[in-house]
């Protein structure tokens, strides 16, 4: 299967007083060393075709000569400054033609030539050749890269005529190779000679190689201006399907203050990859972030605005340097990812044994074959270092997408056929069904994160309108009307089922249930309700347990962070 996210080639064309020129293309066009040998022998009409050996060549742009590409890719001036897209058979060309608006005052005064002439180049186009069936998001991303490179080249051309100098060098080398080919056996590709002598050609080659491998492009055009680009399709992908950038962007927009940022590499190596002129705020976020610290705490510790932390976190996630998780705490439930490698002698198993000498990866992963909360691994008599190592192992497995986290969702389920709900005293308590511990026992990890406590309370903007403390206390007429209004959106049989629950006789419980009713549609997990309503976990679990006859509990991934948990590095 071909990789439709990688470009077939990169091409640089120009148009000017000397006509349309193909300055550089990479990979180089494959020349047929013995064209006569293919036509000297007559072929039978029943002979098997040998074109399969050159399928990649035929699918690419190598069948187009330099002259043809220069003609079709060097557009008119009217098309400059906008997206260029051309499909020919199974090849799609994407670029951003750019006009060079030269003025006499912009010609370099340091030119030693006695007669300086105006530059002959009118426009240029950096084009990426793709397969015709490439995803539209890939096409848009490569157009964005072409536009960035064109903008930098246009700036350097105005500043020091960089593009004109490189073009003159390339054309001179092409003429030299063409003259050499006249005395040899056949034509030679000039790009072999251009590559080691032209900085711009090497930059385009580096961009192509990076797009085909890591997807991260870092260029310094003219050893001066930086072009940074990320092809998210190369960084974010699942085991068997392509994750479009739109899905990543939707998840990033859904980040909440109770989420956490998990770096995918150690702090030292990540800081070493940052450019010299990077934002100091980004450095502070990297140094302050922790897997047990939510974004709200991260903003406080880094002394940054929460919105700025969101933006920096989204930047790190988009570039594949971090993922979004829920902060580690005892109540978190994890299970083995369906995409995890469980081979005994896999490279990951070797890395795990090197990182944690007293443990082996298959045995640890076996403990997560079924959903399990971290509280089940706690041993009150064990030293604190053992608990710290447990957190480190979970973080290590989350970084490599070996584990996925499951959240608790609650759905209102009242059957129309039931005239009255049947209380089930022999049922397993709700707290046991969701993996919770005693409601009066605080569940905090030794890392000391407030988010890992059973009594986690966070301040939320929505809390002002929905917090129970703001409602009048007691069974007042106002409270009764508010409860009736909240229950008015339900059907008749749903209201009857709820009111027939014994706990509904308690006005406080009924009012709290009615206030949380819009969360009982299976779209908000337990931790989100805790944050939005500024409510403790124990309060919610007790309420769910009292109304368990009309509630159905499910556990699955949070759609916001599920896209990050499914990604493979």
Swiss-Prot record:
GO BP: aorta morphogenesis; cardiac muscle tissue development; cellular response to amino acid starvation; negative regulation of TORC1 signaling; positive regulation of autophagy; roof of mouth development; ventricular septum development
The protein's name in its UniProt record: GATOR1 complex protein NPRL3
Described function: As a component of the GATOR1 complex functions as an inhibitor of the amino acid-sensing branch of the mTORC1 pathway. In response to amino acid depletion, the GATOR1 complex has GTPase activating protein (GAP) activity and strongly increases GTP hydrolysis by RagA/RRAGA (or RagB/RRAGB) within heterodimeric Rag complexes, thereby turning them into their inactive GDP-bound form, releasing mTORC1 from lysosomal surface and inhibiting mTORC1 signaling.
Region (Disordered): 27-60, 416-477
Keywords in alphabetical order: Disease variant, Epilepsy, GTPase activation, Lysosome, Membrane, Phosphoprotein
Location of Phosphoserine modifications: 476
Quaternary structure annotation from Swiss-Prot or TrEMBL: Within the GATOR complex, component of the GATOR1 subcomplex, made of DEPDC5, NPRL2 and NPRL3. GATOR1 mediates the strong interaction of the GATOR complex with small GTPases Rag (RagA/RRAGA, RagB/RRAGB, RagC/RRAGC and/or RagD/RRAGD) heterodimers. GATOR1 interacts with GPR155/LYCHOS; interaction takes place in presence of cholesterol and prevents interaction between GATOR1 and KICSTOR.
Classification lineage: Eukaryota, Metazoa, Chordata, Craniata, Vertebrata
Gene label: NPRL3
Tissue: Widely expressed. Expressed in the frontal lobe cortex as well as in the temporal, parietal, and occipital lobes.
GO cellular-component term (any): GATOR1 complex
Family recorded in the similarity comment: Belongs to the NPR3 family.
Cell location: Lysosome membrane
Record keyword Membrane present: yes
The keyword Membrane belongs to this UniProt entry's keyword annotation: yes
Disease: Inactivating mutations and truncating deletions in the genes encoding GATOR1 proteins are detected in glioblastoma and ovarian tumors and are associated with loss of heterozygosity events. Inactivation of GATOR1 proteins promotes constitutive localization of mTORC1 to the lysosomal membrane and blocks mTORC1 inactivation following amino acid withdrawal.
Disulphide-bridged cysteine pairs: none
Gene Ontology molecular function terms on file: GTPase activator activity
Biased composition (Polar residues): 34-52, 438-468
